[in-house]
C-alpha cells in the first residue's frame, strides 16, 4: 500500500499542528525528542503548551519556546550535528512510512524538507511540503532565531491558507 508523506511549514502560531491533525494519519514532529528532554527540566509538562510565557524559577524572560529553540538548534544542530533531529525523526516515522499517511507538523530547516523528499523517494511514496498561512500570523522579520525564518520557497509544493475558525477546530 502506498501513501503520502507530508511536511508542514509556516510561521509560529499559524496552526500547523491543528492542520496536521485535520488530515488524519500519523502526526509526528522533528521536535519530539527536544520536547521529551524538556519535560525533565520544566516545572510541569504543561509548560510545553505555554511556549511564550516566562517560566517561573528560570532567569527572567526564559520561555519554553526559547528553550526549545536553543536546545534544538544551538545544542543539537550546531554543537552535535545538523541532522540529529532528522535522524531521530526518521526512526519515529519508519514504522509508518509506506503504510499510512504521515504528517510532520514542524518543518523549520531546509534539511528537514529535504529529508521528507528523500524518505518519500526511498519508500516510493508521494510527498508534499505544505506552507500554512493565516492572516495576522506572518513570519516576524524581527524574530532573530534562525528556526523562525522559514524555509526557501523552492522546497514548498503547496500553499494553504487557514482561517481562525479552522485553527480553533
Identify the meaning behind each predicted range:
Residues 6-8, 104:
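Hydrophobic anchor at the beta1->P-loop junction of P-loop NTPases
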Amino acid at each position: 500500500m502506498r501513501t503520502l508523506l507530508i511536511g508542514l511549514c509556516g510561521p509560529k502560531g499559524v496552526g500547523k499542528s491543528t492542520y496536521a491533525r485535520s488530515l488524519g494519519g500519523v502526526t509526528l514532529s522533528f521536535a519530539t525528542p527536544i520536547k521529551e528532554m524538556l519535560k525533565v527540566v520544566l516545572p510541569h509538562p504543561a509548560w510545553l503548551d505555554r511556549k511564550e510565557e516566562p517560566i517561573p524559577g528560570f532567569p527572567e524572560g526564559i520561555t519554553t519556546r526559547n528553550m526549545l529553540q536553543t536546545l534544538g538548534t544551538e545544542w543539537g544542530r550546531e554543537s552535535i550535528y545538523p541532522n540529529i533531529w532528522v535522524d531521530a525523526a526518521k526512526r519515529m516515522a519508519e514504522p509508518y512510512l509506506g503504510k499510512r499517511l504521515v504528517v510532520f507538523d514542524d518543518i523549520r530547516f531546509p534539511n528537514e524538507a529535504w529529508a521528507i523528499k528523500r524518505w518519500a523517494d526511498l519508500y516510493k511514496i508521494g510527498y508534499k511540503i505544505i506552507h500554512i498561512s493565516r492572516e495576522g500570523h506572518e513570519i516576524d522579520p524581527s524574530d532573530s532565531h534562525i528556526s523562525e525564518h522559514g524555509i526557501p520557497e523552492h522546497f514548498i509544493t503547496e500553499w494553504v491558507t487557514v482561517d481562525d475558525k479552522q485553527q480553533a477546530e
